[in-house]
């Protein structure tokens, strides 16, 4: 189901709780909402649709990928980026890394470890920040 975009900075600044198998329906809501905003959005976190759970979705070279409980375990190649967000007006500068290694659970709640680089890595960092209550 397409959900409205949360814009309340107090809600968005809260840390999200770990996701469980009971939160699988949130992943579908994220898919539907990301698809509805595909012209101006490449990733979302569950708190952006009002669910304070550690779930993100992002465009991974044309395919939507969902991660439950993502954590960056390694990063390298710091740089300054300028980013926008559906939940906040305008753009802001922030520190990002060119390469990240992420541990997460897939939609079967199997633990995975994968390295991402470039723009995809930047998207993932932005969405994991949302899960941690960090707003750009």
Where on the chain are the PLM-derived regions?
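Positively charged
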Residues: 1-136
